Amino acid sequence: MEYDYIIIGAGSAGNVLAARLTEDADVTVLLLEAGGPDYRLDFRTQMPAALAFPLQGKRYNWAYETDPEPHMNNRRMECGRGKGLGGSSLINGMCYIRGNAMDFDHWASLSGLEDWSYLDCLPYFRKAETRDIGPNDFHGGEGPVNVTTPKIGNNPLFHAMVAAGVQAGYPRTDDLNGYQQEGFGPMDRTVTPKGRRASTARGYLDQARPRNNLTIITHALTDRILFEGKRATGVRYLKGDAGTGQTAYARREVLLCGGAIASPQILQRSGIGPAELLQRLDIPLVQALPGVGENLQDHLEMYLQYSCKQPVSLYPALLWFNQPKIGIEWLFNGTGVGASNQFEAGGFIRSRDAFTWPNIQYHFLPVAINYNGSNAVKEHGFQAHVGSMRSPSRGRIQVKSKDPRQHPSILFNYMSSEQDWHEFRDAIRITREIIAQPALDPYRGREISPGANVQNDDELDAFIREHAETAYHPSCSCKMGDDKMAVVDGQGRVHGVQGLRVVDASIMPQIITGNLNATTIMIAEKIADRIRGCQPLAKSNAAYFIAGDTPARTSPVRHSLPVTSYP
C-alpha cells in the first residue's frame, strides 16, 4: 500500500490533518488508529454527562500509569489517554479552553517559533470553531468543532461560584477565550447543538469520510516508522488482535499524531531519540535527538468539596433510579442533565502579583465526585477543581523495549519544584476564601475535603501528596524549537530527518494555561496549511488583555486568612 501521506493517530490533531489534506482531491491519505470506531450509540463517549465512564475501562482509554512519583508518596498515578477515532477528544472533559494569549506570545519569543504568537494562532482557533451564539473577533462560525455556551436556567451553583470569585476580589470575564481570559465566568464546551460530544471524529472525520482519497484503518497499532537513510518512507503496524504485521508506504510524508505519550514512544522505537536509551534497548539509531520524551509536562489538580445546604446539586443524577429518565431525555431530545459536561463555570487567576498572567485554573462542578467517577459524596454537594498552570517540574517518557504493546516508563516528576508547593498552598487558601464569600452563603455547608482541620503548611502538603491528581493534560514531550533539546521545528518537522513531522500536544514548548484540546486542534490546523503549501491565514488584529501593573485582586467582600508570603 502506498499513499501520499500516512497519519499515525486519529486523535485531536490527526483527524484535523486527515480532513484538511484530503480537501485536495489529488492527495491520498492513510489514517491509522490503534483503537476502534467512535460508536455513536455508546452513551459512554457520546453523552457529555457520562464523561467519567470511558476513564473507568480500557476500551477507549490506554490507561497508562506513571512510575512511582517521588514527591507524591510514591503513588503510581493515572495517565488516561484516548483510544479510538477521536483520540482524547473522545474521552476528555469537553471543556473548550484555548489557553492565555500570553502563552502563545511566550512561544513566539523562542528562537524559531516567531510565527506562533497569539495573533498568528487566533485565526486558526476561529477556523476550527462553530460557536452556537455566532462568530466575533475571537470566535468562529463555520468550523468543524461545535462549541456550546452555558444557557439561562442552568444550575444556580455555577452562578453563585462565579459571583463568589468576584466577591473575593478577582475579575469577572464573560468569555474565557475572548478578550480577557483572567477572571471567573462561564465556560464553553465542545458539545453539539443536539447535546452530543463534539470530538474531532464527529467534527472533522465526518466531513472527510465520504472522500475516496481517505483510507481509515482502525485497530492498527503502530510498531515503528520506516526509514531509508534519513528519510521516512512508511509505517510498520500490527493489525487486529492477532497482531498481523502490515506495512504502508508514504510518497511524501509520515505525520505522527500519537499524542504526548505515544509520539515519543514511536519515535524512540523507530530509532529517533536519546542515543544511550536506544543503544541499551538494541534499537538501531536513525537520529540522535536527546529531547525525545523529555520536557514532559502536565497539569495537577485538587478538589475542594463542600456539602450543599439546598437540594440544588446534581447528587440525584448519581442515583441509579434517576438515570434512565436522564438518559431518555438526552437520547431523544438532546437536552437535560445528560447534555452537559457540567463544567459550565470556572476561571483563571493570578495567585500573586508576581505572575504576569494567570497561574491558577478553576473548574466549578455542582456535585462532589472525583473526575473519573469514583468516591462520590453521598449527599448534595459541590466542588472546585483547582491547580497550577505552568509548573517548573519536568518529566520524561522512555520505552522499555521494542514491543509496541508494552506501556512506556512515564514519570511526570510532579511537585518537584518548591514553586509547586507555594502555588498549591495558595490555591487551597484562596479557594477557601472564595467559598466563604456571601454569594455562597445560601449553599455552603461543611468542608468535606480537605476538611477544616487541614490548615498549616505541613497539613496542606500532606493532603496534596496524597490527593492531587492529573488533569489529563500531558504535553511538551517532543517540543518544537531550535535548541539542542528541541525535537521538531516550528512546522513540526523532525530535526535531522526528512519526510517526518510530529503534530500534536507533544510539540508544545511549554504547557498552556488551560485545557489542551482546543490548542491541539489549532496546532494541527496551522501546520496543515504548511503541509499543503497554503498561505498562512492573515494575522488577527484583535486587541487582548495584558495584566501589566494591574493587581491580581482587589479587596474581598469578606476577608479570610491572609496568604502567607513566599520566602
Swiss-Prot record:
<protein>
    <recommendedName>
        <fullName>Oxygen-dependent choline dehydrogenase</fullName>
        <ecNumber>1.1.99.1</ecNumber>
        <ecNumber>1.2.1.8</ecNumber>
    </recommendedName>
</protein>
<dbReference type="GO" id="GO:0050660">
    <property type="term" value="F:flavin adenine dinucleotide binding"/>
</dbReference>
<dbReference type="InterPro" id="IPR036188">
    <property type="entry name" value="FAD/NAD-bd_sf"/>
</dbReference>
<dbReference type="GO" id="GO:0019285">
    <property type="term" value="P:glycine betaine biosynthetic process from choline"/>
</dbReference>
<feature type="binding site">
    <location>
        <begin position="4"/>
        <end position="33"/>
    </location>
    <ligand>
        <name>FAD</name>
    </ligand>
</feature>
<keyword id="KW-0520">NAD</keyword>
<keyword id="KW-0285">Flavoprotein</keyword>
<comment type="similarity">
    <text>Belongs to the GMC oxidoreductase family.</text>
</comment>
<comment type="function">
    <text>Involved in the biosynthesis of the osmoprotectant glycine betaine. Catalyzes the oxidation of choline to betaine aldehyde and betaine aldehyde to glycine betaine at the same rate.</text>
</comment>
<dbReference type="GO" id="GO:0008802">
    <property type="term" value="F:betaine-aldehyde dehydrogenase (NAD+) activity"/>
</dbReference>
<feature type="active site" description="Proton acceptor">
    <location>
        <position position="473"/>
    </location>
</feature>
<dbReference type="InterPro" id="IPR012132">
    <property type="entry name" value="GMC_OxRdtase"/>
</dbReference>
<comment type="pathway">
    <text>Amine and polyamine biosynthesis; betaine biosynthesis via choline pathway; betaine aldehyde from choline (cytochrome c reductase route): step 1/1.</text>
</comment>
<dbReference type="InterPro" id="IPR007867">
    <property type="entry name" value="GMC_OxRtase_C"/>
</dbReference>
<dbReference type="Pfam" id="PF00732">
    <property type="entry name" value="GMC_oxred_N"/>
</dbReference>
<dbReference type="GO" id="GO:0008812">
    <property type="term" value="F:choline dehydrogenase activity"/>
</dbReference>
<dbReference type="InterPro" id="IPR000172">
    <property type="entry name" value="GMC_OxRdtase_N"/>
</dbReference>
<dbReference type="GO" id="GO:0016020">
    <property type="term" value="C:membrane"/>
</dbReference>
<dbReference type="InterPro" id="IPR011533">
    <property type="entry name" value="BetA"/>
</dbReference>
<keyword id="KW-0274">FAD</keyword>
<dbReference type="Pfam" id="PF05199">
    <property type="entry name" value="GMC_oxred_C"/>
</dbReference>
<keyword id="KW-0560">Oxidoreductase</keyword>
